[in-house]
Amino acid sequence: MDESVFYISEGDPADKHSQESFGHSSSVHSSQQHAGFRQADCPQNGACLSGVGTGERLFVASPNKALINVYSWGKESPDQRIPIPEQLSCLTLCKHPRIKVSEGRQSDERNLPSFRTPWLLAGGSKTGKIYVWELASGNLLCVKEAHYQAITAIKFSQCGTFLVSGSSDARCMVWRTSDLISVYNKDEESSINIKPFASFTDHSLPITDLAISEAGIISDLRLYTVSRDSTLRIYDIMTKSLLTTFVLPSGIECVTKDPANRACYVGLSNGLIRTVPLYQINPNTSVLESIGGRGKIVTLDTDPNLLSTFVHHQQRLSTEPLHKTLNKKTTTEEKPILVTRLSITMDGSNLISGDSAGRVYVSDIVSRQVVKTFAPCKSSISYIQVNACAAEKVSVSNTSSNNNDKRHRLIPQFKRVLANPDPLEHQLYMEIPKQQEDEEDFESWLARKSQEELEFRNLTHINSSVTVTGAAPTTNDSTVKELEEKLAKVSKAYTDLRGKHEELYEEHNRLLSDS
């Protein structure tokens, strides 16, 4: 098992060298580079990767054109340049919902078709509109004027129930996915007049980033939003309420959260990364308690001892790039370094961060020290994504399947007008993989049959199988032996008593007959 980090830069139209940008995918725990993508640059949050390995795709919004570039994993140049109605500023993907087919049987993610796509692609534009496409058909399912200014961040919840958008107008909107894709409803009026599930207007400056908790229960969904007004706000999506507001000493550019929801990590506009703990130990009761709640405002002071601060992004490079030196661009020395993107590994032990200078670091969260440095980009980092993957899945030799017929790699072109509401016109292009037969040995087959027989006999959903635990087998054997000896003695005494009774009864009958 390995973890792959994908990062991409923003690009600078004024600098011709920065246009020779690359998107990189490298290993966190080794020096292996998994993939590279040429001419890949995008605005902040303007890219999304469906996964790691053969058959996966990268979607990149062009920073200065109304195009979406689509890359296939293992291929450096873009496969498709898809025109869209207007220029997009951010992208996000929604995967297909997982449906449980049968009881006790789960789908095998290793048995994937060579042609596969996620379910939905959503994008936010600079005019404040939300676009939603279905990737398997290319249909445009939704065009919604959601904000007054440019949308800066857009994300689906892990379950796909909600779509959250943040904008420069300082508003954050939560939409139901089912409402946005209701183009096939018979009621056209309801599909046009879509209202947000929740609207949060507590920020006073543009929202720069947001994160959604990966909760197994929908009632536990939490929304984390950050803004240049130096606040981190935590909302409960289902109750539509503000839980906690954290005030930091500087503007916030990005946010990520711990996988176990123990803390948040925010990148500041002064080049620092602050840890925001969500739990603390009460010194009086020694009990772990949550911080904030019920709309409480928590102010985080400066950290002079650097107990919860990462400072490695404030260190400038000793030598500037050669092309900047030749062009005599000395103004870059005076610009402050911003932490633009943050992500975290699967176990929550390493923090991946990118800044406006194009540097990407892997830091240990406990020691707050840099453990690895990736190849730098020539402009600001605009997107970082961490994916867990198998080592053989991302090997270079495994990309030979990309040389198949090009028709099998291309996805349908995106429509520029809304889809036909007639469900009969809804056509999908999908590849159904061959059903993989399960291989089981004779012992597992016997165990499964015995369990089925037990359930059949019980005729109930309660499993009445009993597992004996407790005393050792030697103690049980001695107890049984002692009870057997007592039973033998009682049986012998009863036999003797019965014999005496029969002798006395015969003597009694003999005396009666003589008299």
Curated annotation (Swiss-Prot):
SUPFAM superfamilies noted in UniProt: WD40 repeat-like (SSF50978)
InterPro entries assigned to the protein according to its UniProt record, in alphabetical order: WD40/YVTN_repeat-like_dom_sf, WD40_repeat_dom_sf, WD40_rpt, WDR18/Ipi3/RID3
Bias type Low complexity, positions: 20-34
Gene Ontology annotations for the cellular component aspect, listed alphabetically: nuclear pre-replicative complex; rixosome complex
Residue windows of the WD repeats: 104-143, 146-185, 202-245, 334-375
Top-level taxon in the UniProt lineage: Eukaryota
Primary location recorded for the protein, binned into one broad class: nucleus
Stretches for region Disordered: 1-36
UniProtKB keywords: Nucleus, Repeat, Ribosome biogenesis, rRNA processing, WD repeat
Annotated compartments: Nucleus
Function: Component of the RIX1 complex required for processing of ITS2 sequences from 35S pre-rRNA.
Protein name, per record: Pre-rRNA-processing protein IPI3
Taxonomic lineage: Eukaryota, Fungi, Dikarya, Ascomycota, Saccharomycotina
Gene from which this protein is expressed: IPI3
